[in-house]
């Protein structure tokens, strides 16, 4: 059995734990930066632009049927340096809750931070269905030696 290997081309550097890439029609890519606590646009030439500073730990993004960017925010993580990279560890001391945010231009609002009386812990990724509803995952938090697990 043989595997194809891809040739990678680095477009930009210096992102702070990027996740949730969303390709844009203009050739740019939106990424959330968990450690950077923001939504960033990376242009085809590698230039980076901060779209919105969201706080917490933005962890996944999708374009909604209304054209806005919807973000799963895990509420933040502590990071530890391991050699040249930072690795996420546990819930930070300033953690409040996870949330779902809506970004229009450079402005954002928090749509949800709970569901049926339960706080969102760590929303991770989201997707829109054909009728415009969105689904998201919430994988919980690590608090010291304990893990709080959630669901879709």
Regions found by a protein language model. Name each.
Residues 152:
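Cysteine-cluster motifs in flexible loop/terminal segments that predominantly coordinate metals
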Residues 1-149:
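Sequence-structural signature of mature extracellular/luminal beta-sheet repeat domains
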